[in-house]
Amino acid sequence: MSNKLGNIPQIKLGLVAVSRNCFPMSLSEKRRDAVAAAYAEKYDREELFVCPTIIENELDMRKALGEVNAAGCNALVVYLGNFGPETPETLLAKYFDGPAMYVAAAEDDCGDALIDDRGDAYCGMLNASYNLKLRGVKAYRPEYPVGTAPEVADMIKEFIPIARAVVGLGNLKLITFGPRPQDFLACNAPIARLYDLGVEIEENSELDLYAAYHDHDGDERIPALVEEMAAELGAGNKMAGILPRLAQYELTLTDWA
């Protein structure tokens, strides 16, 4: 069945590396590129935009934010290539209009970049998580968010359906019908958590729905919609006589203002 309403968001991820200024920026850059290469090898490279700016400070953060927005990214992967600067790396998720995930680099061979090859971002991930909590910024972190380049690539892929759900819900509007007048939101349903997800809710009168349904009596679009429904049902079309009424009801809802 085709997705006629286009209501399944396509996710484009922005991969943004961060670096604390007491570490060489090249370490985060090298590790970011390794993650991007691992992702391209295992998955669809077109899903991932590699942000050219590496964030060390707030000015970098604003530049990177502009770059991911210009690239059309609707989800963010903040990658701690080393310990990471807590303020700008968490402000990025605060100002980005979409879901964000935080992941970090495990220890690897840093070559001449660091003494004793130390360079994992485990401690930085702990501090980033603490800072996100202090700011009240919601961001996804995998159960174990520190890994090698291939492991981080897998984490990014696993984030896509989560990001898709968040983006989809954030653009969702529920139009409900009840016994009260139009847009009279006095229901006792537990809607607070829906608001937390960015979902909008508008309650309308059942009497208005009834009137709108009959406004579509004899609608010229009904026969074509009935044919489409019958084709979708195929052998499962056991109650063909009800399809005109269902088509009229569907048109009533899709025309709802």
Q: PLM features: what roles do these ranges have?
A:
Residues M1-A257:
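An N-terminal assembly and electron-transfer interface module characteristic of large anaerobic redox
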